[in-house]
Each structure stands twice: as structure tokens, then as C-alpha cells.
UniProtKB/Swiss-Prot annotation:
GO biological process terms on file: ribosomal large subunit assembly; translation
Keyword Nucleotidyltransferase listed: no
Protein name: Large ribosomal subunit protein bL20
Role according to the record: Binds directly to 23S ribosomal RNA and is necessary for the in vitro assembly process of the 50S ribosomal subunit. It is not involved in the protein synthesizing functions of that subunit.
Pfam families: Ribosomal_L20
PROSITE patterns in the record: RIBOSOMAL_L20
GO cellular component: ribonucleoprotein complex; ribosome
Originating gene: rplT
SUPFAM superfamilies, alphabetized: Ribosomal protein L20
Length: 117
């Protein structure tokens, strides 16, 4: 059986980690052990925050819709209920965009939803 020297494998593994740690501050991008810890932490945070981003955006949309709805004299929960009755199928993202970019159109949506009781 031939002898396997692991120098190349180890160097490749360490280079991969240091490449991922590029841009980190201080020893976090220079020393393998600290770089490895920071890369693992960064990957953990990235995984968690990809899921958290969806919740954050939904909360932002609801906040924006609620603010605009209250300017039009109705609460968010009542607006969503009336929109369901009026069969208006705009999702929260679209409604929030309307509320920010085109307040007149949003007011029209509120008006149409309010009439369908």
C-alpha cells in the first residue's frame, strides 16, 4: 500500500476556509482557527437570516398597509376582512407597494373593499 501524504488536502481545505473568510476583520481573515470559527458562525447566521428575512418583510408590509389604511379611516384587520368579502386578491406585498407609491389607488382599493359588505 502506498503512503498518502495529506499536505495537499490540508492546504486545500484551509485555503477554502480562508477564501470564505476574505473581508473579515483582523485575525478572522488571517488565522485558520479563528477564520474557521467565524466562517461557521457567518454561515449559521446566513442560514437563519434567510428565513428571518421573509418574516421581516411580511411585518414591514403589514405595518405600511396598516398606516395607509388608518389614513383612509379603517384598520388593517378590517381592511383584510373586507377585501376577502369583496374578492380582491391583492397580496400584502402589492398592497404595501400601492400604499407607498400610489396612495390614490390604495384609497380606491379601500373604498371598493368597504362597499362590499
Amino acid at each position: 500500500m502506498t503512503r498518502v501524504k495529506r499536505g495537499n488536502v490540508a492546504r486545500k481545505r484551509r485555503k477554502k476556509i480562508l477564501k470564505l473568510a476574505k473581508g473579515f476583520r483582523g485575525s478572522h481573515s488571517k488565522l485558520f482557527r479563528t477564520a474557521n470559527q467565524q466562517v461557521m458562525k457567518a454561515l449559521r447566521n446566513a442560514y437563519r437570516d434567510r428565513r428571518k428575512k421573509k418574516r421581516d418583510f411580511r411585518r414591514l408590509w403589514i405595518t405600511r398597509i396598516n398606516a395607509s389604511a388608518r389614513q383612509n379611516g379603517i384598520s388593517y384587520s378590517k381592511l383584510t376582512g373586507q377585501m376577502k368579502k369583496a374578492n380582491i386578491q391583492l397580496n400584502r406585498k402589492m398592497l404595501a407597494q400601492l400604499a407607498v407609491l400610489d396612495p390614490q389607488a390604495f384609497a380606491k382599493v379601500v373604498e371598493v373593499a368597504s362597499q362590499a359588505q
